[in-house]
């Protein structure tokens, strides 16, 4: 089966972030100026910056065909399938009585390489396909080296008992747990989570409403970003229905 070996960062700059395609992030290809385009990813090519300025921040000037083409390309690159394979899955989905789009996603999600990726045994679907092709994955105690193998309910997916297989999968699982712990620590410092944790708002939706309405100040400055990272000794004041509540944030 053919696989994509070209530049991956260029693809995600064009059609958006794809978790199953690559771990790369276009940090150096984002607009560093001020305004509504700050932080936006610059499209690839010589005239990428010109295309970014032509795009409107709250309205799309893309045609319907271009929107559907991008969605199709996202499916192809994310799941690592060819155009011929995608057409085959679409034809299978059309034969079902249920919604074609929902059945198509179910067929793609039941592929063995995708399930190995969802189990966090590999960082990307491409890496999961490599694990399968090298014989590290077993299905129902039998070695399967076909990445497009369609799994069924109650199938048991396990790792080969070889030392190299266990070492490789354990390393990927440890990297995933470290990444999740870092995300959790970062989430605990966000302004919306701090308001919810201090019982100022009953839920996250109410905390977001306080922030969007401009009722939250940090160090006597109004903050409108829910993902604002609080630092230790920051003074946070919230204007609620029962009055103004102030507290000091501590990690």
UniProtKB/Swiss-Prot annotation:
This is Small ribosomal subunit protein uS4c. Part of the 30S ribosomal subunit. Contacts protein S5. The interaction surface between S4 and S5 is involved in control of translational fidelity. It comes from the Eukaryota. One of the primary rRNA binding proteins, it binds directly to 16S rRNA where it nucleates assembly of the body of the 30S subunit. With S5 and S12 plays an important role in translational accuracy. The gene is rps4. InterPro entries: Ribosomal_uS4 (IPR022801), Ribosomal_uS4_bac-type (IPR005709), Ribosomal_uS4_CS (IPR018079), Ribosomal_uS4_N (IPR001912), S4_RNA-bd (IPR002942), S4_RNA-bd_sf (IPR036986). Keywords: Chloroplast, Plastid, Repeat, Ribonucleoprotein, Ribosomal protein, RNA-binding, rRNA-binding. Belongs to the universal ribosomal protein uS4 family. Residues 110-170, 189-251 form the S4 RNA-binding domain. One of its GO terms (molecular function) is rRNA binding. The keyword Ribosomal protein applies. Disulfide bonds: none annotated. It comes from Tetradesmus obliquus (Green alga). PROSITE patterns: RIBOSOMAL_S4 (PS00632), S4 (PS50889). Its main location: plastid. The lineage of its organism: Eukaryota, Viridiplantae, Chlorophyta, core chlorophytes, Chlorophyceae. Pfam families: Ribosomal_S4 (PF00163), S4 (PF01479). GO terms for cellular component: chloroplast; small ribosomal subunit. CDD domains: S4. It is found in: Plastid, Chloroplast. GO terms for biological process: ribosomal small subunit biogenesis; translation.
């Amino acid at each position: 089966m053919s696989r994509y070996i070209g530049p991956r960062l260029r693809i995600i700059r064009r059609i958006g972030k794809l978790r199953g395609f690559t771990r790369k992030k276009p940090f150096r290809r984002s607009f560093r100026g001020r305004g509504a385009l700050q932080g936006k990813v610059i499209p690839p090519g010589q005239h990428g910056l010109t295309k970014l300025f032509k795009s409107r921040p709250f309205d799309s000037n893309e045609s319907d065909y271009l929107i559907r083409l991008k969605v199709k390309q996202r499916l192809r690159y994310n799941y690592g399938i060819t155009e011929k394979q995608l057409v085959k899955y679409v034809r299978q989905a059309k034969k079902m009585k249920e919604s074609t789009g929902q059945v198509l996603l179910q067929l793609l999600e039941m592929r063995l390489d995708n399930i190995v990726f969802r189990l966090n045994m590999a960082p990307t679907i491409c890496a999961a396909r490599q694990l399968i092709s090298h014989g590290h994955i077993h299905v129902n105690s039998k070695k399967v080296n076909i990445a497009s193998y369609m799994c069924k309910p109650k199938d048991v997916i396990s790792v080969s008992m070889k030392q190299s297989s266990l070492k490789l999968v354990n390393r990927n699982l440890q990297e995933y747990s470290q990444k999740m712990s870092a995300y959790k620590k970062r989430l605990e410092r966000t302004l919306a989570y701090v308001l919810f944790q201090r019982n100022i708002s009953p839920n996250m939706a109410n905390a977001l409403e306080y922030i969007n309405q401009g009722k939250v100040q940090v160090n006597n400055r109004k903050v409108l970003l829910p993902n604002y990272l609080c630092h230790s000794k920051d003074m946070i004041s919230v204007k609620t229905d029962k009055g103004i509540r102030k507290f000091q944030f501590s990690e």
